[in-house]
Amino acid sequence: MRRLLSLPFRLLRNILRRLMLRTVADMRGGKKQRYAKEALLRDVHEYTAVWAYLVGAAFLFMASEMALLVPTIAWTGSAIFLYRAWVRGCHGYYVASYQRNLLRLPLYRMESRALRQLKNQFVGMGFQWKSIHAQRLYDIELHKNERFTRFSGSYDRARDYCSRQHHGLFARALARYLDSDSLLNPWRPAPKLEGKAWLHTVGMPEGEQPIYQPLPTRVSHTIVFGTTRVGKTRLAEVLITQDIHRGDIVIVFDPKGDRELLLRMYLEAKAAGREDQFYMFHLGFPEFSAQYNPVGSFLRVTEVATRIANQMPGEGQSAAFREFVWAFVNQIAKGMVLLGRTPSYPLLKQYSADVEPLFIDVMELLYQRHHYDYRKRLAEFEAALLMSAEDRRKAGFNFTIPRAMNDRSQRGKAFWLLYREVGDKLPLTMTERDVAMSMMKAFQTDASYMAKLVASLDPFLEKMTTGAVSRLIAPDFSDPTRDVFSWTQIIQARGIVYIGLDALSDAEVAATVGNSMFADLTSVAGRLYKHGADHGLPAYPKSGYQPKICLHADEFNELAGPEFVPMLNKAGGAGVQVTAYTQTLPDIEARVGSKSKAEQMLGNFNTVVMLRVLNESTAKLLIEKTNKVNVSDIATFSGSSDNPDLTSRVRFRATVQSREVSQSVELLRTSDLSKLPKGQAFALLDGNNLYKLRIPLLQYDAREAVPNDIAAVARAMEKNYSNSPTNTDWARYQEYLREDDIFADGTYSSMQDLCNNYLRELDSDTFMQGQAALMEAE
């Protein structure tokens, strides 16, 4: 109700503010600056002239006879005085608003529906950072202008009063008043955005503009840097919302698990009419998650071994053992594919422990496929294996079994002997013969010796097949209640996929599954790149919009691996546009193992967005791409000298000089990036043009119904992944949602009742908007 009553006052204030700033802009537009130095950090002397003009206008209007003027002339003079008062007032407001915004900027909120019809990619409100902004920033940081960057003493005392406990009725009421965001409160608290607000204020005199990223440039990939809790995920919400409503294929990797991001994706998919295309894969909630096989889809069978071997250590002597792992897994994968079995981690674990069952199945298939009656001869070999060496010679069997095969079964040995005898005579294809030779080699190798060579494979497979995670990455196609997806299916259906990797619980499994998914997606992208965008896809009408594959990778440093390099290098031709979010450059270096590999990855990102970063090497990625500019200051020199001529009437000479002194500085400094408030960023767009951005905090138009499974996951994510110190951060929705959980525990007759229950907790106007939205949806 309080907001509703203050709405007319806020509206009137905004109208007057825009009108006054427009007046100043019209008067300044197209004119050269009158003075060598812009003077925005000074006392607002214009208001004195405004009062003088107003008094003169009132005097001429009400007492023209005392000015000895006829009323017509007096009223004309009064109108001129009023006009001059307006002009000088606008100039004064221009300076005063600039100084006021040095300490506080209002929160930038936006309704998500405003992003649903944009042709280009909106990244925020801001301006292009130029030399004038570096000049203003230089002026602000001068010691003589320090008073403009400090709050008043009364404001500090008000904040100190609100921070203490109060027990009296009047004291508590006063604390609530001083802590309220009301126009009637001259000491209302500044938004808790941290950082230095003037980094954005320096561009406010010219005004903010919507900053867009042209869609064709997105295939050259984007990387977003920012330290913890400064707005990376909120920027991701802005970009993902537009991708969903544009009809693109959206794939989001979220290692840590962000509740608001999951809800945002589902609600925007529902608003776009794409609810049926939404899939959720979450390692932390297997009971609600869709299923996916990381090694079940491939273009070449060798990709299975590559995806697994890439998870093995490959530095130093470990590189040789990784090659053994690759060869062993490749042998198993070839046998499974020949049998028509889809590779999966549980099956790979089973056959890596004992390859004999796979060997027997492959041999039986080959004999049956080529109509060879092997059973009689196989039985003879089995019987011969039970004989002594002398009896075998008498029976006409002249063979020896390698010592490495002593632990194998009699049936397996019989198949091995049979293939040695008749293998060359069978009309096998090249592929079949290759698989048969691989199986023979794997079978006759000493199991204990092979176990030592591929010792690093067992821990990896244990990670991937332990607990409930194994049910997610080994899909059960006979279960009708669980969705199973593949990347080809997602691309065909223009799907929207949220992938929660639960890295806070198990970072190793999260990284492994994420890398396997990347490798699978890279394979699919390679197929599209070679055979065209329509390969395996429905025939889209040529006049329609060709959907892109929008890949968003939060906490990119936890997912970066060898699989990511070919995706960045070549997948742009298949329509894959990657947006990666990470904290620092050293995080990526630590993940990939070297600085050169990290730079190889970063060289493929043409668009860089940098929120607050504290690491100097990370900040230099942006700083080194900007040029130097000249900033100026007015230096005053004074001096005096005595006149030695005693006969002259001039006893001394005094001089005062003002000089404009310039110096070369960086257009942007590393220290500026460490002082950015939350939700603000610098970005290199459109060919290394530097922009300063404010990222909007998206608001829900009204809470819509959310399915029970997604609601349960959201509740658990809020409980398990969040902690109380961050609940007041800018990067959360506490500004417009109450602290109560959006999904209250209890039983509801319908999802509409759940939605209504939440909306009743909001103010009345929001509740009415929500009711109207629900009725319109019905």
Where are these regions (language model features)?
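P-loop NTPase motor domains
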Residues: 16, 20-26, 202-206, 215-228, ...
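P-loop NTPase motor core of the ASCE superfamily
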Residues: 39-44, 76, 316-334, 485-489, ...
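Basic- and hydrophobic-enriched, low-structure N-terminal and domain-boundary segments
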Residues: 1-230, 234-239, 287, 657, ...
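Short hydrophobic alpha-helical runs that function as membrane-insertion/retention elements
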Residues: 249-253, 277-280, 577-582, 608-612, ...
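Short acidic-hydrophobic sequence patches enriched in Asp/Glu that either
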Residues: 94-102, 257, 261, 563, ...
